[in-house]
Regions:
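Intrinsically disordered, low-complexity terminal regions
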Residues: 1-266
Length: 266
């Protein structure tokens, strides 16, 4: 019965996406997508704090050796009115950079133009703390961070952290959640990753040492490192220490979906 409900939700989601796609295609035929590129730079101390509240679109954040925040934002909409209504406000101080994005107003009529997205590409000091990233719908990628911690929340879409050697608290409501490491380091880190509806994947090197606690409420947990899945009612769970001197703690949770931990073999 649960599988049937899950399948029906997926069918409904697919139908909605196709319907929205047809609306977007009609708008594109009526007029091309307008763009406005915004580029800004702000100094930020290596131990500073960064936060971003985005609107629908994409966010790519890269940790660098610099002591500044470089922002490239591409605003997109179907009309000049909605393009100009997208506001990007930056509060920049020596130890804090905070970006707030305001979307165009919600139209009163159901079939009115609802366009308005921002594609962010942001470089920040790799040792900075990411206090908050909020993205409603789209794709969020965080790469190469080594600060105190990362906190990120995505309502719908895909979230990826890659080679981020710091504590992480990351959440996706619906879509896909990925935690990737090409190699591991001895620095102790703790990762709390949770997805409500969708799959969670982790990729770790073969020689990784870590404590894994993964629970899928209505799905399966699988790992290339261990076949020791246990079931408690509808829950699938793996709770195991892999390797010696494990200083990395992985806490993974999936509501409706699966969790898989795979090995990176070079």
């Amino acid at each position: 019965m649960k599988n049937i409900r899950y399948a029906l939700r997926k069918i409904a989601l697919t139908t909605t996406v196709l319907f929205l796609g047809s609306l977007i295609a009609s708008s594109l035929r009526a007029g091309e997508v307008l763009e406005d590129v915004v580029e800004k730079r702000f100094p930020l101390a290596p131990s500073g704090t960064f936060s971003l509240r985005a609107i629908d679109g994409t966010v790519e954040i890269f940790g660098t050796d610099s002591q500044e925040v470089k922002i490239v934002a591409v605003k997109k909409a179907f009309s000049p009115e909605r393009l100009n209504a997208i506001a990007i406000r930056v509060d920049a101080r020596q130890n804090v950079v905070n970006i707030e994005t305001t979307p165009p107003p919600v139209p009163h009529h159901h079939f009115s133009d609802r366009s308005g997205t921002v594609e962010y590409t942001i470089n920040i000091p790799q040792t900075a703390r990411i206090a908050r990233i909020e993205l409603p719908n789209g794709e969020l990628v965080i790469d190469g961070m080594r600060g105190a911690s990362i906190a990120a929340n995505l309502s719908s879409g895909q979230l990826v952290t890659h080679n981020c050697f710091c504590d992480q608290t990351i959440h996706v409501n619906q879509g896909e959640l990925n935690v990737f490491f090409d190699w591991m380091e001895e620095r102790p880190i703790s990762i709390e990753a949770k997805i409500e509806d969708g799959n969670l994947s982790a990729r770790l090197p073969t020689d990784a040492a870590f404590h894994l606690q993964a629970v899928a409420k209505e799905g399966h947990v699988s790992s290339d490192f261990s076949p020791m899945e246990t079931r408690k009612g509808d829950d699938s769970e793996i709770n195991e220490v892999i390797g010696d001197n494990a200083t990395t703690k992985l806490s993974f949770r999936a509501g409706e979906g699966n969790i898989h931990i795979s090995e990176v073999i070079w």
